[in-house]
Amino acid sequence: MAILQDTEGFYYSTDEYLGNPSDYAIHNARLLASMLINNYGWTDYGCAGVFSAISFESQFNPQCIEGRRSEEYARAHINDAVGVGYVQWTPPYNIITWSDDRGLDWKLSSTQCQKLEAERNREDVQYFTSPYRIQYWQTYTGGTTPPYTMIEYTTATPEQWTALQMAAAWILFYERPESQYNVSNYQRNEEWVTYWYQVITGQPLPTPPTVYPPGTPIEPPSGDGRSKMPIYFYPMFRR
């Protein structure tokens, strides 16, 4: 496996994950948080919420293509169920074509930050709360109001929402995978919200939570009648 460094200082590999959380992933997470906080006004807690998902989707490899496939493959399957980039945009046109149309290089972290910003400002909407609010409220019977917009989410603070609520909101409102009803996914990502918050804020590195390889299936409770799918970005739910 060759680990290289791009012109922006981020480590990447064209054929492998970086490790969860390897020194490479931690390095990239800190740089990415700096971009999002300083250039776009995110909070460290908002970054941590999104990073909890990136831990499983790409392990902070900006050039990650699902299945360790090549860019040529992604371009040949531009409308298919192939995840690309930090958050595994699916289909690939969501990041590759979007970048090409603007004269940008999708492989750069700065480009992927611009894409997230376009989504955040509802220029290219990815964050939906309806009809997924119902599932959120069913999970949190106390009636806690979720972050209704991506701006609310990315500017969140620990005083507003718990790590579990941040994990659940991102899965339900942004990722929308087939396995969205499996609460164990929220609990899995909750640990990583806390982990990345400590990393970003400069606290001593905590012990990482349990590591799952990207694409590890998390089975829903037996007998619930729902499809058992990995927590991939499922195209019928992404727009």
Residue ranges and their predicted role:
Residues 136-139, 204, 220, 229:
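Intrinsic disorder/low-complexity segments enriched in polar/small residues
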Residues 4-35, 39, 55-162:
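Peptidoglycan-targeting cell-wall enzymes and recognition modules
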Residues 44-61, 116, 169-171:
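Short, functionally critical alpha-helical segments immediately adjacent to catalytic or ligand/cofactor-binding
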Residues 42-48, 205-208:
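Short, surface-exposed acidic
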Residues 2, 149, 153-156, 160-213:
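Active-site or metal-binding loop neighborhoods of secreted/extracellular toxin and effector enzymes
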Residues 30, 163-168, 229-236:
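Extended low-polarity, hydrophobic cluster-rich segments
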Residues 1, 212-239:
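Enriched but not universal
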